[in-house]
């Protein structure tokens, strides 16, 4: 188990300055209320492609995963014979870029909301499966060479997150989880003010203790207030 930052948030913060600077995110944090959180937690059009105050404000493909998939491919030694699962794949952007970079690789996506699947990329849609809950994931032991879960499981409660991480450990040879965390109370409050869908937010030491306790041996990255530029 190791901490691995493949650069997603560094790239995102650098390339979205022109339309979503830190001060704009702070303004959104100040404006977001319970109705915005209700709309966001439907994980429907309003969250993905509606107003920015309710979610992404337009979840569109931009090819950004190709920038840091190079690191992922190298670290996890992925090739055309590999099987890769993306948990919480949304519209399939990670899978699309991975397929483009390694033609012939076996890609699988699981998504627990129907809107992003319906609006996923046509060349990827057949590779995405709807699942009511990631706690129901059911594959054979070490079925996948690599399992990826990018900020997709923290919307669950702690008990379910433990179930999901145990399943990730069971079905993967190697894995990487990105999950929100904080160090200081100030970071925690900033993130809670910003997030629309966050349910389980622990500090970094708590996540590490939990990983060790449940036997998770995969890699991880902690996102949070600093990652989002708050």
Please annotate each region the language model reported.
Residues 1-76, 85-139, 156-167, 174-230:
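Class I (Rossmann-like) S-adenosyl-L-methionine-dependent methyltransferase catalytic domain
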Residues 81:
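Phosphate-coordination loops involved in phosphoryl transfer and adenosine-cofactor binding
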Residues 145, 173:
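Conserved acidic residues
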Residues 148:
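A conserved beta-strand element that flanks and buttresses the S-adenosyl-L-methionine
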Residues 151-155:
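Short catalytic micro-motifs in class I SAM-dependent methyltransferases
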């Amino acid at each position: 188990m190791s901490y691995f930052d493949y650069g997603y948030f560094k790239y995102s913060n650098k390339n979205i300055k022109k339309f979503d600077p830190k001060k704009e995110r702070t303004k959104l944090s100040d404006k977001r209320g319970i109705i915005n959180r209700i709309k966001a937690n439907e994980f429907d059009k309003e969250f993905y492609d509606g107003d920015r105050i309710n979610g992404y404000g337009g979840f569109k493909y931009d090819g950004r995963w190709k920038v840091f998939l190079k690191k992922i491919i190298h670290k996890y030694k992925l090739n055309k014979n590999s099987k890769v699962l993306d948990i919480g794949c949304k519209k399939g952007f990670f899978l699309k870029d991975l397929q483009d970079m390694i033609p012939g690789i076996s890609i699988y996506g699981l998504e627990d909301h129907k809107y992003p699947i319906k609006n996923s990329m046509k060349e990827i849609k057949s590779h995405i499966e709807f699942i009511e809950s990631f706690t129901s994931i059911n594959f054979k032991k070490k079925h996948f060479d690599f399992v990826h879960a990018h900020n997709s499981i923290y919307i669950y409660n702690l008990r379910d997150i433990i179930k999901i991480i145990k399943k990730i450990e069971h079905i993967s040879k190697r894995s990487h989880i990105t999950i929100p965390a904080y160090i200081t109370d100030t970071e925690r409050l900033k993130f809670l003010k910003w997030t629309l869908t966050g349910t389980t937010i622990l500090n970094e030491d708590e996540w590490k203790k939990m990983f060790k306790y449940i036997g998770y041996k995969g890699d991880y990255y902690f996102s949070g207030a600093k990652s989002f530029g708050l």
